[in-house]
Amino acid sequence: MRERFHQGLDELRARLLAMGGMAEQAVERATTAYRNRDLKLCHAVLASENAINAIEREIDELALDLLAMQQPMAVDLRFITAVMKINADLERVGDQAVNIAERVMSLVKLPPADLPIDIPRMAATVSGMVRRALESFLEAKAELAEAVLKMDDVVDRMNDEAYVNLVNAMHSNPDITQQALDALLIARNLERVADHATNIAEDVIFWVRGADVRHHQAAPE
């Protein structure tokens, strides 16, 4: 029974990493679609939503089966709990990617505008957070997860700066209002992806160290 339980834990880890790869790819495709005004990539992101939702359900079912199989030791219980929470955050990352793709589809219908926002730079930072959060899970390294927490403030500042700049641009040139609003929503979605990456990092620290570092409390050694 114990061997089957550990096989289940390995399967749970593998499925979550697969889902993480899908969610990360969806964000990268959506932001590349913005950069290239690529409708084909937008549709690919929309098409990926069902697959991400399906694997989310599979992970939840497997996690519940493992909890019912036997009473896990503390570290295994923390692992399963963390996986279920990370699973929910990854599904929401996929949702944000869909939101970005939909905004890009709106933007492509409009004339290009010179907007005071660097979406590719913000996207690169956010994608890096998601990637590092997943690496911290794969390697069970709280130090990697802590680096993600520090990056969240950087993205928040980018989002705040984008808001101010885009609102000013709309006042100066009302003709670009819709383009600016779409870009503003994309920035907000990216900021939410960063929040989910932060949640994932916090869950990894909880699993590895048994420490609750939500609200950016310092994690004990």
What residue spans do the PLM features occupy?
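Cytosolic, long alpha-helical scaffolding segments
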Residues: 1-221
